[in-house]
Amino acid sequence: MADRSLEGMALPLEVRARLAELELELSEGDITQKGYEKKRSKLIGAYLPQPPRVDQALPQERRAPVTPSSASRYHRRRSSGSRDERYRSDVHTEAVQAALAKHKERKMAVPMPSKRRSLVVQTSMDAYTPPDTSSGSEDEGSVQGDSQGTPTSSQGSINMEHWISQAIHGSTTSTTSSSSTQSGGSGAAHRLADVMAQTHIENHSAPPDVTTYTSEHSIQVERPQGSTGSRTAPKYGNAELMETGDGVPVSSRVSAKIQQLVNTLKRPKRPPLREFFVDDFEELLEVQQPDPNQPKPEGAQMLAMRGEQLGVVTNWPPSLEAALQRWGTISPKAPCLTTMDTNGKPLYILTYGKLWTRSMKVAYSILHKLGTKQEPMVRPGDRVALVFPNNDPAAFMAAFYGCLLAEVVPVPIEVPLTRKDAGSQQIGFLLGSCGVTVALTSDACHKGLPKSPTGEIPQFKGWPKLLWFVTESKHLSKPPRDWFPHIKDANNDTAYIEYKTCKDGSVLGVTVTRTALLTHCQALTQACGYTEAETIVNVLDFKKDVGLWHGILTSVMNMMHVISIPYSLMKVNPLSWIQKVCQYKAKVACVKSRDMHWALVAHRDQRDINLSSLRMLIVADGANPWSISSCDAFLNVFQSKGLRQEVICPCASSPEALTVAIRRPTDDSNQPPGRGVLSMHGLTYGVIRVDSEEKLSVLTVQDVGLVMPGAIMCSVKPDGVPQLCRTDEIGELCVCAVATGTSYYGLSGMTKNTFEVFPMTSSGAPISEYPFIRTGLLGFVGPGGLVFVVGKMDGLMVVSGRRHNADDIVATALAVEPMKFVYRGRIAVFSVTVLHDERIVIVAEQRPDSTEEDSFQWMSRVLQAIDSIHQVGVYCLALVPANTLPKTPLGGIHLSETKQLFLEGSLHPCNVLMCPHTCVTNLPKPRQKQPEIGPASVMVGNLVSGKRIAQASGRDLGQIEDNDQARKFLFLSEVLQWRAQTTPDHILYTLLNCRGAIANSLTCVQLHKRAEKIAVMLMERGHLQDGDHVALVYPPGIDLIAAFYGCLYAGCVPITVRPPHPQNIATTLPTVKMIVEVSRSACLMTTQLICKLLRSREAAAAVDVRTWPLILDTDDLPKKRPAQICKPCNPDTLAYLDFSVSTTGMLAGVKMSHAATSAFCRSIKLQCELYPSREVAICLDPYCGLGFVLWCLCSVYSGHQSILIPPSELETNPALWLLAVSQYKVRDTFCSYSVMELCTKGLGSQTESLKARGLDLSRVRTCVVVAEERPRIALTQSFSKLFKDLGLHPRAVSTSFGCRVNLAICLQGTSGPDPTTVYVDMRALRHDRVRLVERGSPHSLPLMESGKILPGVRIIIANPETKGPLGDSHLGEIWVHSAHNASGYFTIYGDESLQSDHFNSRLSFGDTQTIWARTGYLGFLRRTELTDANGERHDALYVVGALDEAMELRGMRYHPIDIETSVIRAHKSVTECAVFTWTNLLVVVVELDGSEQEALDLVPLVTNVVLEEHYLIVGVVVVVDIGVIPINSRGEKQRMHLRDGFLADQLDPIYVAYNM
């Protein structure tokens, strides 16, 4: 690794590589320190600023250390000890640094996420930009890198990664999200945008598209053309305000980040992968073509490799118990095991005599002292758990051999520390499946187990009920003289079960028979050359794996002495094992590479170290390719202390195959160990290609020795049929031997796949009649029969057809500077399957003192390093606070639990970086719009195929004969006068207050008289003329109704306006002002209270109060009657104006004529069978649409009584509406979605108490949700389910549908069939097609019929582009022809160019005479098998969504609600969601119901679910507080208001993530 002093130097890559090679030669002892210095100075001399002398050229403290001791050199470089030793490799580190240096040239603009201050983990003074009122006046980091632009930092010059801090636009550390934060200067941002737009990396295929497909007809109707897509570079910063289409000022900070993200994504992407994912009936994409240049195996087919003959030595015992008996009786004083305390002093020496007698006691006690004589708890062959801590091998050994003597099967497991340990549940599953009822443990361990208040050991999560039995001598019974264990020769009974944790976290039990146990000990004895009374130092876990096989089993067979070093001692003194080797002159030591690394870190040139006694240093994790550097470094340092090169013996093992291979201790020191430098690129294709160490992406592997004695080994292809590999191919190593496991306990299917494999030759013939066992290790057999392992099957991640090993990715991440960044090297790498491919996720613990800037820079570097070295993208990189990842019992990271937490959104990261744009290369092809087939061809096609044209109509108004007296009158004002004369005391309206009591009521004559007085007031005080417009600003109630009819009596045109909210004047009053101005109201009528509010100081701050028209307060009315009541001269004149703000933020007023108003009321009267004797409960906002008509008009026309319940009253009493419905025994009721939601959420837990209060909904015949959108099935269904117990019939709940051009098209009446639900394929819908599927099929979307078509209404489905009629079940725009259509827009605020053809369109083919109104909604008609009231087949209308809400992405049409539904399902804490697009990026805003710490959990889950279900990449995820997403009175989301708020940086988000 080049010295630190070289970091600032621009050395060519080959020089750096040569330096790395020199470094390696030095570390391997090939050259001396002096030679190294000489060659090094020669190499870099040319690049030093002052050539005269190397010494002078380097600053004193940076001068290369010239010390004879390579040990201290090693120590100085690696003193941190924080990095995970398993993956330490200086060569690899050098490669990573070189790769990053390469990246320096091509800057990568990664927008830094925004965080709310409360969410920033580490608050350090320089981590924040001080709040500043300027809108980005200072240049916070320009691309040129001017001196003042670089962020200040504690380390002075940031030479190595200076670029990243600049590339992250202006946001050195702007982690807060308040609008006062400085945003990047306009110049810098502009330059950056240009740089990014022109950056050319490698000319490969373009990214999946985020910027290419803009919609062909503008999606946001209210935005002028060219407002988003056409601008090449947005205006940033300073005085210029960036604006959205309708002139909303936008914070340059948010927009700059988005622009930066867009520019970053515009760059050509590296992997030239074809998009290959085919998942739709018509998305026929080319199958991914294999890369023609990918390496393929070319060698001959490998031959199975035989190990040496297992020689039967004459004095080998017939079984392990027999060996114990022999040594226990003939050498009882011989030491068997010495345990150490935490000070390194011998704690206990177990002799063979003691082991024999204690094991006998254990065997007798478990067979005879548990349960009763007649019913013993444990019988021979039963399984028992062994639960012993890592510092008590003696107790474990006695219990283990006790079980063998009793012919009971021990199942060693870890000590459970809490009731909810990581992975503990799976251990419980193993114990349950093994039928374990007894657990053997030690006294100390038993005392340390968690206890309940009564002192009992609680049942651990997922565990069976256990009897805990302590195996200390005082708890054991001495066996009687006549009892003796049954010692027989090894047979095929199970000896013990070793647990194994799988990739998915499940725990399996590998059964090892007594024969296999004995044979394995014999094979190890032969391979390692063990002899009697040798001393062995064991640092490994003695309960499983190499530690168990050498330190507990083989040692007893050979009467060896084991010195056991507990983990707790290693933590305190990492050199302890080396000291014990010296102290006891041990011949063998069993360690892991981390123990060697720790010893190196702690080593301080101790004098008394002498390792010449060691003949074998077994490296248990030698199969991990990254262990080689620890081995090399260890040899380098301790060679001078008597350590010989041939002593280091890596081995490979697996729970299933036990020891797979081990390097033999040779006496020939001239034969160097085998090593190979392999191309990582080749390895990803499973091919062995030898490379040179100069290359960046290479993996250096060491051999793990030869095949075990008595075994045969081969390698087979990792997937599919177990076919033999070629000689230059990587495969899964398989072993055929006696000394292996035999099955997974109780799992015959999995056992067959692993333990009964018959490798095949290329011709398909099996190579042996005996089964082989899969080892789970990936590797190959090299020259000379040496076995090499390159990784594990469990760590394999197959991304886009290439195989990557998790360990390799970890090694690269840990080699990224600063190496100390990852806390104690705690990092987890795994893959998650998203959209039919595996995606790499990296989770790391960050140091407690890391700033946001540090984290972000480190993450950016990791992405680049992995991209360079492995040529693979990282899907998600998450950082969590130190010490928060789930741990395994030995302190490692519990991988499957970490993955589980990530997937369920409970990982709580403090930083997240998602890169879906880089990684996801298998999206379906963007839809290419085909040239439209002409409307005539479509019609002919339908006729030929026998499909009817999609048109339908309600009953004909003219043909219905009923005794409708109101029909005689053309105008509603006349109907009211008639009712006041004929039925003066009939109550028309009853208004309820929040307690459910009657607040007010109106009879026909009272309403008539009040209307007269208001008419007088308008004429006398207001001096209004016939046809003047009057704004009615009233709360929902009776005053509003009276004012409306007063206007009609005076000949004025009323406009109902929602009054401003007293607590929120700033945002609600401007809308009132706008409607009053746009409607050209000459006068404003209201109550005294609101009158004061309109002129208050708060109002003056929000609007110009001087420009209000005349304001009349109707609390004080004149006494006299009008001279005459105005009668309109023509039914087509204006009756009233209906103003409403659409969900796209457009204010539109429609004109309703007197004729249309009367026809509307008549249609509803017929559909709902309304008569004077009926009562209808209405809980709706009375300001627009059907809500206004039901509240103000219908009762006067039909004569029924309306019970009015203002929706705002439900906020204080959610049960008000339903209690009123029950109390008045109402049969028909109308509500809005917001009311239904309020009841569902607010009364969910109160149904029992409501039942007790006598709430009864059994009389309800129709409960209609008034809506202008697709029916919300989930809400209506949960409402029906919830109140079913209170008598509500599910069939009663339905929805209506109306829009601006016709306020009510459908409404479920009293007769006719129930609304039907169909399931359509969501993917087909995106292509504007309807494809009906079965319920529950993938990608199915339920659509409920929007009620029944009203009388007098005709509907046709037309193509919105060609205006041609479409066939049945085809998706198109809903066109409507009806007497109650609105007669046109009065004004549209937001888009003046909205054509009049909305109201008078004609079909381009077919019936070209009828005039239709275009609703702007997509839907389809479907003729059902059901029968209508008139005996004909019923036509159902299904509404899909509004055209102007739909988003066109990748050439497909998406309805926001579908994406939002998926996102809300993604995590329990998401309460609401809204999506919109910005510069063709999809922005998802989610409301978080939980702690702010959960905010970042949502980012990956939201990204995943949208990818999986909609094939879209989310560009920005914004996490906000509850209630931030604006919702209008109809319960619809105001997505465009939200969008403007986001871009103006007004949302105060908790977190904003910019996905890369």
Swiss-Prot record:
Belongs to the DIP2 family. Residues 81-93 have a biased composition (Basic and acidic residues). InterPro entries: AMP-bd_C (IPR025110), AMP-bd_C_sf (IPR045851), AMP-dep_synth/lig_dom (IPR000873), ANL_N_sf (IPR042099), Dip2-like_dom (IPR037337), DMAP1-bd (IPR010506). Residues 170-183 have a biased composition (Low complexity). The modification Phosphothreonine is found at T264. This is Disco-interacting protein 2 homolog C. PANTHER family: DISCO-INTERACTING PROTEIN 2 DIP2 -RELATED (PTHR22754), DISCO-INTERACTING PROTEIN 2 HOMOLOG C (PTHR22754:SF33).
